[in-house]
A protein has these predicted regions:
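Structured, hydrophobic secondary-structure cores that serve as assembly/anchoring elements
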Residues: 279, 286, 412-426, 430-440, ...
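Amphipathic, heptad-repeat-like alpha-helical segments
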Residues: 45-48, 429
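Short amphipathic alpha-helical/adjacent loop interface patches that line ligand
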Residues: 36, 43, 53, 419, ...
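Bacterial flagellar/type III secretion structural subunits and associated motility module proteins
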Residues: 1-37, 50, 54, 58-169, ...
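Conserved short loop/turn motifs at secondary-structure junctions
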Residues: 35-45, 285-296
Length: 450
């Protein structure tokens, strides 16, 4: 009976085997990577909450300052004639303003045809006098008109010089640097030769426009000013005169309700922004089957609760406005604030009480939200500690991933070595099996001949 043997061993796909085993070893790393993605998303979300809270804190701090509620605004019935700006010291009042004349700077020019040779104005000394100040300018022979102009401008004597060509030849024009009668100039020319005498005033040049003061009436009181910008004439009010009036202009100073209202609505917008974001990120959306990045995050939920609690607290700072709802700021079911404009406008008519309601330390609404911001954003604050905790978790995750990656690399090296050795052993066994099979075949042939 012939002797037979089954095949012994075969070539192994070492790479495939090792790859599959290593993939099993890498599963904990994949779990860590997924966890890190979630941690990064949470960190980003907490970062947005911090940013939104900074906005709330900033607008609340503004509302918590006393000078915010004392701002005044000036309005003019004709701002093209009289523009008005209220200062911090302004008080509510109304003014009737008539502009009888505007302040002007003096303008002088040489007589037409007086300068025939612009290349050489001659020699002499120009002395420009403004008030009690006299500035001498020495001109040497051979100085051109342009050079004379430049010397005058460099002297800063209260006028600027320019050359104008009007068809009769060059003319030198002087413009006063400042308005008002006190800034009128006279020009004396001494030791002059050539055309330099044409620059004297009043004997040589022509006055095209006199230096003049502004003339106006405020509530019937006659006022004269060297400038068209009047500061300090009316306490707490700056006036800018632009043209002569035919009818009185009414300037009214009142409380800056628009700025106050914007401050309050800015607070509402900042509050709604953080409230809606936290509400969305801390809940599970049944429609999309997606959980918010901060669902179950105690810090985020705590932040949302503190915001709503602070909003609903009553205050004894004002006897008129004890809760924000009295101002028309009502908390809605979704956690946002809705503004009742009629209520808010009525409250803005009483800025003194609003100031008490928002600025009183500890109990004022503005002070409370500023304090909340200081608390949660501070070094040991709720949002800061949560941010630091997430960063620490990400750091530990990175270290764990690195440790496991190093372990997987060692396992891969060991498995590759072991299976390569096994593959070599099987190859040797295959070789031995072939030899044995050959011997068996030979034995069978010998047996058949017998």
């Amino acid at each position: 009976m012939p002797i037979s043997s089954p095949g012994i061993g075969s070539g192994l796909d070492v790479n495939s085997i090792v790859t599959q085993l290593v993939e099993l070893e890498r599963r904990p790393i994949a779990a860590l990577q997924e966890k890190k993605t979630k941690l990064n998303t949470q960190l980003s979300s907490i970062g947005l909450v911090q940013s939104y809270m900074v906005n709330v804190q900033a607008v609340a701090a503004q509302l918590g300052k006393g000078d915010f509620w004392t701002k005044s605004v000036a309005t003019s019935s004709d701002s093209t004639a009289v523009a008005a700006a209220a200062l911090a010291s302004a008080v509510p009042a109304s003014y009737s303003i008539e502009v009888l004349g505007l302040a002007s700077a003096q303008s002088l020019s040489t007589v037409a045809g007086a300068i025939t040779d612009a290349s050489n104005m001659g020699a002499g000394t120009l002395t420009i006098t403004r008030g009690t100040t006299a500035v001498p300018i020495t001109i040497v022979d051979g100085t051109s008109l342009a050079a004379v102009r430049d010397q005058i401008n460099a002297a800063k004597a209260g006028v600027t010089a320019a050359i104008i060509q009007d068809g009769t030849g060059p003319r030198l024009v002087f413009s006063g640097s400042d308005t008002g009668t006190a800034n009128a100039v006279s020009i004396a020319v001494t030791g002059a030769t050539g055309q330099l005498t044409a620059l004297s005033y009043p004997s040589g040049m022509t006055q095209d426009r006199p230096a003049a003061n502004a003339s106006l009436k405020i509530n019937g009181l006659q006022i004269s000013s060297a400038k068209n910008n009047l500061s300090g004439v009316v306490d707490g009010l700056n006036l800018t005169l632009a043209k002569v009036t035919t009818n009185p202009v009414q300037v009214t100073v009142g409380n800056d309700s628009a700025t106050m209202k914007k401050g309050i609505t800015d607070f509402v917008s900042a509050f709604n922004e953080i409230s809606r974001y936290l509400s969305t990120q801390t809940k599970y959306d049944d429609a999309s089957k997606v959980a918010g990045a901060l669902q179950g995050d105690r810090s985020a939920v705590g932040m949302l609760n503190q915001l709503r609690s602070t909003l609903q607290q009553t205050s004894t700072a004002s006897t008129v406005y004890t809760r924000l709802g009295d101002l028309g700021l009502e908390l809605q079911r979704d956690g946002s604030i809705k503004v009742d404009s009629a209520k808010l406008d009525a409250a803005l008519a009483n800025p003194a009480e609003l100031s008490r309601a928002f600025t009183t330390l500890q109990t004022g609404f503005g002070q409370r939200f500023k304090a909340l911001g200081d608390s949660v954003l501070g070094t040991e604050g709720l949002l800061t500690t949560r941010t630091n905790g997430l960063r620490d978790s990400i750091s530990r995750n990175d270290k764990d991933q690195k440790r496991l990656e190093e372990r997987v690399a060692r396992v891969q090296e060991r498995l590759t070595r072991q299976y390569s050795a096994l593959d070599g052993s099987l190859n040797r066994l295959n070789g031995l099996g072939s030899y044995v099979q050959q011997q068996i075949t030979n034995w069978n042939k010998t047996d058949n001949r017998l």
